[in-house]
Regions:
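Long extracytoplasmic/lumenal interhelical loops at the membrane interface
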Residues: 274-336
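Hydrophobic transmembrane alpha-helices and their immediate junctions
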Residues: 49, 55, 115, 332-370, ...
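Aromatic-anchored transmembrane helix interface
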Residues: 36, 57-72, 79-105, 116
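Flexible juxtamembrane loops connecting transmembrane helices in multi-pass membrane enzymes
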Residues: 234-245, 257-290, 314, 406
């Protein structure tokens, strides 16, 4: 029996499985070979289908990738060969994250690509959940536990992506649907609600509270949008329209970086510092402010192009990284790379807004979840870029005719 492989679905699936996550049981050198092979295959796919990518979008992505590459190469002597290699590879991946997603969705449609993404990610999600329970729940923290695809943050962000894809695939409301509140219970919905409950419990069990916040944030917005819209239709539509504006999304990214400055300033107020110490709540807050105090000094030394992707410069002061998404991007790529990241965020959200549908809103909710989490974690990476690409392509899909979209 002949098995026909859809190259578009396969390209997205191998991108997810080999360029976004790593199986911890596989050795570093072996996985590196996998990554290089997949990068080359995806590059061939992109080159042969480059006509599907708008020129201005491609130029923006290449500019962002080059900012990472230049910073990495300039700092190669300080960072060493392995960090330099990682930075060069990430540069390559950035281009593929956007272009593979854009091409695949333009050729096969967002529903097919989302379904293919969901199916392949289940190959990682199921064993990850098994290893979470096998490891058990530590009394203090689960950050050092190693699961199927990494630590608790890797599993938590996978949960967020799975939730986003599930919401997208299960939002079948049409624009001319009645706005009355109808809740029909069937086996499919029971399965969906069960999945929601599982990922919420898993994040709580792992003590991945940032991931738990992201999931609850997305779920609340999705529930309000779908089931309560008939009561607050006008106000809610206005709110969604407001947060969907590309300028608002971009400003939100900037604001997520300002939290580092604000929190450090608040902790320097004697009364607040003494109160937090008296109730034993200085832990994570204090450790982050110790990092934030040194961020300005670190960035000022190389403000234009930064220290290169993967640089361990922050660890020389306090902590493994900047504990803030935008600050980490600025450390990696400087002002230039940060500006380009903001620019491509604006571009993708401007294109995505053209979809004007509740289905693609799942990607917008996820983007905001990553933005909010970036105030205390490093979330502006590959997953964030792919979500931007998916949301952007949904806007293009809505704009183009069916004949332009599908082969």
């Amino acid at each position: 029996m002949n098995i026909k492989v859809d190259i578009n679905l396969a390209a997205v699936q191998i991108m997810w499985l080999f360029l976004m996550m790593k199986i911890t049981l596989v050795g570093q050198s072996v996985w590196m070979i996998f990554e290089l092979t997949v990068c080359m295959l995806c590059t061939i796919y992109v080159i042969t289908n480059i006509k599907y990518v708008p020129r201005n979008a491609l130029m923006l992505v290449i500019a962002l990738a080059m900012s990472y590459l230049v910073s990495t190469l300039v700092n190669r002597e300080c960072n060493g060969p392995w960090i330099t290699y990682t930075g060069v590879e990430f540069t390559w991946k950035i281009i593929l994250y956007f272009t593979v997603s854009w091409i695949a969705i333009k050729k096969r449609g967002s529903n097919n690509i989302a379904k293919a993404s969901w199916n392949c990610l289940m190959l990682y999600w199921v064993p990850s959940i098994i290893t979470v329970f096998a490891q058990g729940r530590n009394v203090i923290d689960n950050a050092n536990n190693v699961y199927f695809i990494g630590n608790k943050f890797n599993v938590a962000y996978l949960n967020v992506v799975m939730l986003c894809l599930l919401l997208f695939l299960n939002n079948e409301r049409k624009e001319n649907c009645s706005r009355s509140f109808v809740l029909k219970i069937n086996s499919k919905k029971i399965g969906v609600f069960l999945f929601y409950a599982v990922i919420v419990f898993i994040d709580y069990y792992m003590k991945a509270y940032t991931g738990l916040f992201m999931i609850l944030f997305i779920l609340i917005l999705a529930i309000l949008s779908r089931y309560l819209q008939f009561r607050i239709a006008k106000k809610w539509s206005g709110f969604l329209n407001f947060i969907g504006k590309p300028l608002i999304v971009t400003i939100s990214v900037v604001a997520s970086g300002l939290v580092a400055i604000i929190l450090e300033a608040i902790m320097n107020i004697p009364t607040i510092g003494a109160y937090l110490a008296s109730i034993g709540k200085t832990g994570n807050i204090l450790s982050r402010t110790l990092i934030y105090k040194n961020l300005a000094e670190i960035i000022e030394r190389k403000p234009l192009i930064g220290y290169g992707y993967g640089s361990a410069i922050v660890s020389r002061y306090f902590g493994p990284n900047a504990q803030n998404g935008l600050a980490q991007v600025m450390i990696y790529t400087g002002i230039l790379g940060t500006f380009l990241m903001l620019l491509i965020t604006f571009y993708c959200c401007k294109a995505g807004r053209q979809s004007k549908g509740s289905q693609s809103a799942a990607f917008l909710y996820a983007i905001y979840a990553f933005i909010l989490s970036a105030t205390v974690e490093i979330t502006y990476g590959g997953t964030f870029f792919i979500l931007l690409a998916f949301y952007c392509a949904c806007g293009w899909e809505k704009k183009l005719s069916r004949g332009d979209m599908y082969e």
